[in-house]
């Protein structure tokens, strides 16, 4: 810092000033200013003792400004910024002036829904439907045109339903199903260079779940199986094309990125007596990409007057089919023991195991160039850890005060909690989706905390 300040304090650049010193290094702030307004309204109506209806509307509008500003000139008098196209030879700026980028976006959203709940001794039913519309705009103040680019409104809808049937006082079976559309975020509709995606697809979720609950005074069990199809996940990839008149970073819009998530979940609680509770939770998932994907690169074409006359499109393909979804263990189980030896005292031990933890990766890394890379991503080693918890509620009449103590990773295990496949920055050797190609993040070593909670 001292060297930078010394340089900036004695740096006359006659191209800009013969008396003031030019800063070559500065401190800057990133700006994110938001103004949001909205209206939410709901109406509840009881048809009878069994049926409840609810409808509502949600309207919101937001304006977001993104920019950077000069925070500290570090000894100099001014700084020269070259990001604004309106100043080809550079713009002289001082404290508080905008640099690097300056754009504004707007988001206009409106939606409505209708839902109903039916309850009876044997049967509970739930259903809802909703629609929404969202519109984006983007304005880059650092372009000569300073044009407001507005995308067409995007409409979505969703339908959900569920049923619970109580076979008897101990056993109930349930089913849930839903279809949800999610509009792509602004970055996947209008990119930072002003390119608007052509007919962006809504992300689609189709979820089905079937299960049962069983409960007695000493035993509780919940079992469920699920299947979720996630269609048309919206992704983008930045590329250095070197095409066009600028050769700047451009964008590939990926379409048809589909995933299938299915699995089984079991929760069990056993209470032999009032002093002991035993818990077992098990989850097995099979989460994979379903099918390959296509990518579309779009670049604006200009005439001699620098006017946009069309869009050039290039197609790409990505090898995704059958690859595991990363960044989340797909198998896990928890064994728990809870003791309540005296009134107010609670002791608990939780032994947690995680397996089939595939490294995080991005679909854009599987672009097909020649032979498709369909090798499975790296699977990090499974791991287990023990957490201990204790709490004691003080027997003080009229006060709700508890003492708490926690010991996490009590056995001080060393384990890989997260990983990145074929890391760009920390991998070694050929990229073959192996351990030496991965970037790993170790879990937190043993640590503890204690505290006091007071409820009023």
PLM features: residue spans?
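Transmembrane beta-strands of outer-membrane beta-barrel pores
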Residues: 59-65, 120-122, 131-137, 177-183, ...
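Outer-membrane beta-barrel transmembrane strands
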Residues: 23-54, 97-119, 124, 152, ...
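C-terminal beta-signal and adjacent terminal beta-strands/loops
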Residues: 344, 353-367, 392-456
């Amino acid at each position: 810092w001292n060297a930078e300040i010394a340089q900036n304090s004695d740096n006359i650049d006659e191209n800009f000033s013969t008396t003031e010193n030019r800063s070559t290094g500065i401190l800057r702030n990133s700006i994110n200013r938001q103004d949001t307004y909205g209206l939410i309204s709901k109406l509840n109506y009881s048809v009878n003792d069994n049926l409840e209806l609810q409808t509502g509307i949600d309207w919101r509008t937001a304006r977001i400004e993104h920019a950077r500003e000069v925070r500290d000139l570090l000894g100099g008098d001014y700084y020269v910024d070259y990001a604004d196209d309106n100043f080809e030879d550079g713009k002289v700026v001082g404290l508080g002036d905008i640099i690097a980028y300056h754009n504004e976006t707007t988001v206009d959203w409106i939606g409505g829904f209708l839902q109903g709940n039916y309850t009876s001794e044997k049967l509970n039913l739930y259903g809802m439907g909703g629609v929404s519309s969202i519109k984006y705009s983007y304005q880059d103040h650092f372009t000569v045109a300073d044009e407001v680019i507005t995308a067409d409104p995007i409409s979505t809808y969703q339908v959900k339903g569920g049923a619970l049937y109580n076979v008897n006082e101990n056993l109930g079976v349930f089913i849930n199903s839903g279809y949800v559309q999610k509009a792509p975020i602004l970055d996947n509709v209008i990119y930072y260079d002003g390119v608007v995606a052509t007919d962006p697809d809504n992300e689609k979720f189709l979820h089905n779940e079937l299960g049962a609950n069983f409960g007695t005074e000493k035993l509780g069990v919940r079992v469920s199986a699920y299947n979720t199809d996630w269609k048309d996940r919206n992704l983008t990839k930045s590329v250095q094309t070197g095409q066009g008149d600028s050769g700047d970073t451009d964008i590939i819009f990926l379409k048809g990125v589909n995933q299938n998530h299915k699995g089984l979940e079991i929760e069990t609680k056993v209470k032999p007596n009032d002093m002991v509770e035993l818990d077992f939770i098990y989850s097995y998932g099979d989460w994979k990409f379903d099918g390959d994907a296509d990518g579309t690169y779009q670049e604006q074409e200009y005439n001699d007057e620098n006017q946009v006359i069309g869009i050039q499109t290039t197609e790409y393909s990505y090898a995704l089919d059958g690859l595991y979804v990363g960044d989340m263990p797909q198998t896990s189980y928890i064994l728990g023991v809870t003791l309540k030896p005296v009134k107010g005292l609670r002791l608990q031990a939780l032994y947690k195991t995680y397996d089939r933890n595939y490294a995080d990766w991005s679909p854009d890394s599987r672009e097909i160039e020649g032979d498709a890379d369909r090798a499975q991503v790296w699977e990090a080693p499974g791991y287990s850890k023990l957490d201990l918890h204790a709490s004691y509620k003080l027997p003080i009449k009229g006060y709700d005060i508890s003492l708490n103590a926690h010991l996490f990773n009590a056995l001080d295990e060393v384990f890989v909690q997260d990983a990145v496949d074929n890391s760009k920055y920390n991998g070694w050797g050929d990229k073959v989706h192996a351990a030496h190609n991965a970037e790993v993040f170790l879990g937190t070593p043993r640590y503890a905390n204690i505290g006091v909670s007071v409820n009023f």
